[in-house]
């Protein structure tokens, strides 16, 4: 579960390393889960890349430490909280995605992120 002030790792090569959640997009929502879009600020970035420190970006959550129940009865959780930075068209700003992503992203129409990911769990 991601809420305001939560730090997340960035799982793409857009230039940002860590982001901090400012707001969970949706109607008066408090927590974000896998597949939800958040507004975040870049806290740590690599130099000479597309994203700079203190930029305001939109990102989609791809991994959470909080256990997620699936309809089949399986439970899944990841080792870290991670997100992929996206543009207004819901396409990733980077060209690569690092680490596994959850299958729920395909149901939420983030197929470009799923196709770039090395592993879908």
Swiss-Prot record:
Top-level lineage group: Bacteria
GO biological process terms on file: translation
Alphabetical keyword list: Ribonucleoprotein, Ribosomal protein, RNA-binding, rRNA-binding
Function: Binds to 23S rRNA. Forms part of two intersubunit bridges in the 70S ribosome.
GO MF, any single term: structural constituent of ribosome
Subunit comment: Part of the 50S ribosomal subunit. Forms a cluster with proteins L3 and L19. In the 70S ribosome, L14 and L19 interact and together make contacts with the 16S rRNA in bridges B5 and B8.
Name used for this protein in its record: Large ribosomal subunit protein uL14
UniProt similarity note: Belongs to the universal ribosomal protein uL14 family.
Cellular component terms per the entry's GO annotation: cytosolic large ribosomal subunit
UniProt-listed InterPro entries: Ribosomal_uL14, Ribosomal_uL14_bac-type, Ribosomal_uL14_sf
């Amino acid at each position: 579960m991601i809420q305001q002030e939560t730090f997340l790792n960035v799982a793409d090569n857009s230039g940002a390393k860590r982001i901090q959640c400012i707001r969970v997009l949706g109607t008066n929502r408090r927590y974000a889960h896998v597949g939800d879009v958040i507004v975040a600020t870049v806290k740590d970035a690599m130099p000479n890349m597309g994203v700079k420190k203190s930029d305001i970006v939109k990102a989609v959550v791809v991994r959470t430490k909080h256990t997620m129940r699936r309809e089949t009865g399986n439970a899944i959780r990841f080792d870290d909280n991670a997100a992929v930075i996206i543009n207004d068209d819901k396409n990733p700003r980077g060209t690569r995605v690092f680490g596994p992503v959850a299958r729920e992203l395909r149901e939420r129409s983030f197929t470009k992120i799923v196709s770039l990911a090395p592993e879908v769990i």
